[in-house]
């Protein structure tokens, strides 16, 4: 799972496609643009990407790796845009605290199920929203942390 502002860099997208083809399930919550196309058979059918633009300018940099059933959690500064990956020093740091890990997982999970502002990012440029019961991730996160 990942949350980032933009997924642009060709090498990053290629690596995500390679992981998908190898059977890795990938969930991505983004705020802005994305050159990744999810849901293509035999290329990105293991990738789900949800884009959310809502009231708050929230765009977490969270990475969660399943790691064979022993999840590893990271937070970082990387925005996954070429200017940031090439011209800046970006960092990731592991998160070991279980309460913090639960918060990070909640942030990703809420984003993936946002039916009010979460649009399916599939490269078609459509406005298809995530299906399900009404759920607004930013509002629910606000309530959880209030």
Segments the model singles out, each with a brief description of its role:
Residues 11, 37-38, 83-85:
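Short helix/loop capping segments that flank catalytic or ligand/cofactor-binding pockets
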Residues 23:
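Phosphate-centric recognition/catalysis
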Residues 26:
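Hydrophobic anchor at the start of a short beta-strand
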Residues 29-65:
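HKD-type phospholipase D/PLD-like phosphodiesterase module
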Residues 52-124:
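HKD (HxKxxxxD) catalytic microenvironment of the phospholipase D
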């Amino acid at each position: 799972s990942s949350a980032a502002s933009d997924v642009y860099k060709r090498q990053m997208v290629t690596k995500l496609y390679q992981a998908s083809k190898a059977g890795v399930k990938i969930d991505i919550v983004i705020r802005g643009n994305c050159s990744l196309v999810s849901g293509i058979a035999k290329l990105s059918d293991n990738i789900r990407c949800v884009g959310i633009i809502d009231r708050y300018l929230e765009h977490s940099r969270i990475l969660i790796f399943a790691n064979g059933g022993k999840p590893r959690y990271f937070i970082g500064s990387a925005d996954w845009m070429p200017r940031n990956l090439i011209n800046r020093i970006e960092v990731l740091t592991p998160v070991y605290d279980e309460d913090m890990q639960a918060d990070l997982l909640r942030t990703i999970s809420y984003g993936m199920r946002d039916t009010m502002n979460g649009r399916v990012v599939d490269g078609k440029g459509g406005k298809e929203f995530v299906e399900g019961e009404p759920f607004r991730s930013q509002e629910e996160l606000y309530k959880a942390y209030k």
